Amino acid sequence: APRTVLLLLSAALALTETWAGSHSMRYFYTSVSRPGRGEPRFITVGYVDDTQFVRFDSDAASPRMEPRAPWIEQEGPEYWDRETRNMKASAQTDRENLRIALRYYNQSEAGSHTWQTMYGCDMGPDGRLLRGYGQYAYDGKDYIALNEDLSSWTAADTAAQITQRKWEAAREAEQRRAYLEGTCVEWLRRYLENGKETLQRADPPKTHVTHHPISDHEATLRCWALGFYPAEITLTWQRDGEDQTQDTELVETRPEGDRTFQKWAAVVVPSGEEQRYTCHVQHEGLPKPLTLRWEPSSQSTIPIVGIVAGLAVLVVTVAVVAVVAAVMCRRKSSGGKGGSYSQAASSDSAQGSDVSLTA
């Protein structure tokens, strides 16, 4: 009955709601073996868009799926019990995957090894699946991945081809596709609705341009965007109306520590020609794109405190990612979160009923 109610509610949302832009739900699972020191450590983090909302750590005193965002705390005890069971089942499956990988690669059990999975879904403004993901890595290298068609696999090497043949025989891609098109999107809609005050907000960026002389002949113009949410933003420099993409230095979007983000884009320009350059900013929170120039009479002062705070959070984030997913090869696609699809998991779970696959 609860499953039926969820499906009905999801169908109603799909018909009546429109979402500002696309949204994503992603899970990352990481298992790290430690010979002589017990079972592998298993860590899970889940994200909706840029917000972490759940975490599981097998090394905790009492391992449970734990909330990491206020809006997920409204889920009842059954939710947390179910997700905890799924995590424990996934941890066991990934331990087996580590043992299988040792055999496939003819490796010794003496060393430490890592098995990781990333899976999830992107949802379009119409509330339907935009793209699904299912990617696996072993010891920091691509192992096998679900293709964009959600019906076939790409194996990275001959060992992964063994897994590919096994999964093709079991028609695992069909099960994965059903989860991504159904359960994954259904739960993403539910989370977006429950956390709409934070997840569906649009904080516009605070913008300015700074000027940094390099020599008597050149200077750097840096276009700043601070305090925006969601993280997706576009910064471009133009010279006399022509894009300067190839000559632009663009940093990755960085967290500021207050659930907003910052980013900058810089170009080196000939001294005296600064006014020929314009910075163009596009963001969901802006009613229309912004166009900025450097104003010589009022050199912008960089808000050092905010930037330092952002860099501090970036360091912490990188440290966490190093434990959870740093060794997973980055793909050009935006990707979802990973984990193994547990055969024993309840179909009411946000993780789905087929998330943990043995290699």
From Swiss-Prot:
Pfam families per the UniProt record, alphabetical: C1-set (PF07654), MHC_I (PF00129), MHC_I_C (PF06623)
Membrane topology qualifier: Single-pass type I membrane protein
Cytoplasmic compartment segments: 330-359
Disulfide bonds: 121-184, 223-279
GO BP terms in the entry: antigen processing and presentation of endogenous peptide antigen via MHC class I via ER pathway, TAP-independent; antigen processing and presentation of endogenous peptide antigen via MHC class Ib; immune response; positive regulation of T cell mediated cytotoxicity
Modification type Phosphoserine: residues: 353, 356
Region (Connecting peptide): 295-305
Name of the molecule in the record: Patr class I histocompatibility antigen, B-1 alpha chain
Organism: Pan troglodytes
